[in-house]
Amino acid sequence: MRKKIVGIVFSVSLLLTSVITIGTISLPKSENILLSGSSLQVEVITGGLGLTAILRNTGKENLTQINWDITCNGGLVILGKKTTGTIPLLRGDSSEIIKVPLIIGFGKTSITVTAQAAEGDDAIKTNQANLLGIFLKILPGDAGALTATIQKIMQGLRSPTVITNAGDQSNRLIIGEQTGKIFIYKNGSRLTTPFLDLSTKMVKLSKIYDERGLLGLTFHPDYENNGRFFVYYSAPSSDPNLNCDSILAEYQVSSENPDVADSSSEKILVRIGEPEMNHKGGQLAFGPDGYLYVGVGDGGGAGDQHGTIGNGQNISTILGKILRLDVDTGTPYGIPSDNPFVGQEGLDEIYAYGFRNPYRFSFDRESGRLFVADVGQDLWEELDIVINGGNYGWRIMEGNHPYDPALATTLNISLESLQYPIFEYSHDVGHSIIGGYLYQGSSSPDAVGSYVFGDWSTGFLKPGGKLYYLQENTSGVWHRFEFNLIKDRPLNRFILGFGEDESGELYMLTSWATGSLLPSGEVWSIKIE
């Protein structure tokens, strides 16, 4: 029997010792992580007061007696020129954080972290940094990494959340603000009249910080002929016990003007009751199969505490899921026959589950793989390749690490049955992963096959977004690199999103404010070399 979702509740927490160790565990691997043997990696270096590095064992086997050192070369280093230590045991698929509590000096220095295990595995990473007394500032980029040239093409937006294209050979970019206004960028400038304005339909947003608003926008694969597009936004709820409703709606372009939508054409497909202000998800994208995929968060609040088992693992609720809908059949939509819970317990709309806040996802243009960035809770951000029927662990797991493992016992779920991230990073690196795209454009051949993404910011008080990419080696292990930026200048922005034009070239959304009070939002083109 068809199990239709009606008014279901949902809600982005976007969003002095020498050695500190956290989160060291050993876990079984899922089918979408292909590892062979042990592999030691140095994943990240962060500065400030002292320096932090993360050592990771990406293999299945434990590593022992990992000797590490952190060395500063260049500049005037008064204290902390070289620090060494030993980690007795680093289990398979685990990581440990090492810290130098204080470095004092002046000038530009090269920071090198090396590590070697008794088994022979070793790793090295070098970053450039500026020393100013006791403060160490890590410069953007990794040694040997690709360089990203970013060019501002639009400004004056209020918290832009979405940038996409219509796929209609018009070469336009369509940008959505969190406030509900959607604009067109055409022939090098933004059109004055909004393509669509949803602001009067939406819940009243906090202008300082909010995770509600216009969160999703995508165009039908045959938009050039049928003029259909879809939005995901936050609206007031009639239920006083709920924070708001998330609305998935369909619209039509105006029959008279291709740069303006028909505002009277709204057809609501799904209305989701939201208990909290955060974890809204909202990403919309059509897959290579022609179906509409929808990202839905876990209902918000900390720790997925709604209901007895939370929402991520509850297949009777829409919350904490990736949905797959057939918007070309049915009323108001149809269900693909191979959705995993068709004909059995669980909602028919569900494609995959066990997510906290799948805020951004995208499909690889070549392989069709679905890359989902799931925003973490306290410690870890993750990137998943999502498959039909996959359980991605939340709240049993946060990334590769136990969060509430007792829930697996309660639900009779084995850890071996879960799907684990292809990559994760700790909150020492950043606070909220912003999913991007596997680059398949033509203007940056060196970047083809690299997954370009970002982190919202290293902190909430000062904008500190980071621009990254992942590369996959022959054994299926993904390595993270920070792009080098021209003139070593940090972004000094919050990263809000990424998008593609019709040719597969990439764009980035940023703001230097956390909310929509000021028109501080910007659009940047990205060229990689």
Model-derived features with residue positions:
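Intrinsically disordered, low-complexity Pro/Gly/Ser/Thr-rich segments with frequent PxxP/GP/PP motifs
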Residues: 77-106
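Surface-exposed loop and turn segments in beta-propeller and other repeat-based domains
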Residues: 193-209, 264-280, 329-351, 395-428, ...
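Secretory targeting signatures
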Residues: 1-35, 68, 113-115, 135
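Acidic, Gly/Ser/Thr-rich repeat motifs that build Ca2+-stabilized beta-propeller blades
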Residues: 138-301, 360-363, 368-376, 429-474, ...
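Short acidic/proline- and small/hydrophobic-mixed sequence motifs that coincide with surface turns
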Residues: 61-65
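Terminal connector regions
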Residues: 79, 103-136
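Asparagine-centered strand-capping/turn motif at beta-strand->loop junctions
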Residues: 55-59
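Conserved blade-ending motifs and adjacent loop-strand segments that build the rim/top face
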Residues: 477-502
